[in-house]
Amino acid sequence: MSIRLSRRAALFSSAVAASSAALPGLALAQVRADTRTDEEIAAAADAWVQRCMAAWPEQPAVSLALVRDGKTVLAKGYGVRRQGKAEPADEHTLFAIASNSKNVTAACLAILVDEGKVKWDEPIRTYLPGFTLSDPMVGERITVRDTLSHRAGFGLGAGDLLFWPNSDRTRAEVLAQAAFVPIEDGFREDYHYCNLMFVVAGAVIEKMSGLSWEDFVQTRIFDKVGMSESVPLARLADPKKSALPHGRVGPPLRYQGAMTQIADSIVEVWNWDSAAAAGGICTSAHDWAKWIAVRLNDGRLADGTRLFSEAAAREMVKPNIIVSSSNGPTAELPNRAVASTYAMGLQVQDYRGERLATHGGGSPGGISATVLIPGRKIGFSVFTNAEESFLLRALRSGLSDIAMNQVDVDWIADSKKREAEGTEKSLKAAVEIDAKQAAGAAPSMPLDAYVGTWRDPWYGDIVIEQKTEGRGRNRKTGLWLRFTHTPALQGWLEPYDGETFRTRFPDKREEDAFITFNIATAKPATATVKGVSPDIDFSYDYQDLRLTRV
């Protein structure tokens, strides 16, 4: 049995990264001349991917794009599109790249800045009159730059339940509900990853261009760059050309157990139409290599024309908020940055004394990474169709070292060690969770006291009802919970310990939750929610729900 952490790990592990912006207070080494040929670098990268695939034999597919000096030196697929099928992945296979889409959204705004239609530091209200947030001051002052920099003051993943898992809410409804999502921290004080503000950025693109986000991406990015295989929305991705999602769905918890295919198409588990600007794109190694070349060339296209200006390119990699800081690498953390920051749609940091910029991406059944090293005019991407975050760590770190010609860490051994430690910790937690339920106190009230409609200001309604299912010995009666805007989040609500209950969603791709009811009078009046698993994906932001009986 094994565990692979959620996309939290893909986005927030000690990432190697890239940027042409200076990092404040950090002296960076001069890049040493690299006399290796493109073929030598490509061969080393190819061999490394094959080693990693051998070390993680359950991984179905990996896709690699490697670019140097504006030229694709390697675009290749490894493995199969779906587990157990003779359907090879190649450089044209589509993968969901999730949050790697964010730097495309930033580039869309860069184009509008160049055209004089948008300013980076202009308040959102200039473009979206009436826009507001739960903190009126933040709603008044927040700018385009803020929406792209994870510094608005929201908690990690705040508001993601508006569109994750697949929701029935429209883009306009998500934008309207953003006004009620709680803001926990100071404005522009701390970094907290926030998909919701990229939805706002996407709305600015739509309002100021007159095009939908997806049409703008298609006509102003994909068509200009020559990315003919890419699609801006997962529902447009042909399943026959896609790497299908895989993951571990237990038992005992999500991200544990055996590897399995979890969907027959990407859109089945990743329909982010309402939040596409935060992570909607599906692309191939063949196409994304072209995008990497544009970013490394500061917006210049292969024909010499510009997609966006050099000034805009510099602005997009200018650090806006500190993610973390440290004393640098150690034997235990060999790739730890001295300073890690977030710019606009890209994370910017140091690595091995050089300036770097990166982003991760994670969707159900797939994680990915893009790494740019502009001082060397080299960059790469790694796409996968499973949630093996330690595999991605080994791939990303090892390929970065190959690109920088400094191979001195065994990233497979390092990642395997961390994987084993994480597995042991998570399985222990799962045993403790089940043991506590077995020994838990009974609820203080009969089950019908908890029945009703429970409302959160930003999510909406959660309905609890009594339900009977099956016949004879298979007959089951109990509480059934239903998130009204999220079809997959419905299932049995079982007593756990006292006034705390836990869900048992039949769809094992989803994360279960604890609900604790607060007894005010004769019936529960309010309730709070949190995830069951210690490895829960941050986008299940149950903890932000504040339920009141309607």
Where are each of the predicted segments found?
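Short, well-ordered beta-strand elements
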Residues: 358-359, 369-372, 376-385, 527-529
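Contiguous hydrophobic, core-forming segments of folded domains
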Residues: 374-404, 408
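Boundary at the C-terminal end of the N-terminal hydrophobic targeting segment
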Residues: 27-29, 33
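Active-site SXXK
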Residues: 46-49, 64, 70, 95-124, ...
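N-terminal secretory signal peptides and thylakoid transit peptides that target proteins
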Residues: 1-17
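Peripheral terminal and inter-domain segments
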Residues: 33, 323-324, 332, 397-550
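Short, conserved catalytic-motif segment at the N-terminal edge
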Residues: 36-97, 117-119, 127, 133-134, ...
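Short, surface-exposed loop or secondary-structure junction motifs
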Residues: 82, 136-364, 369
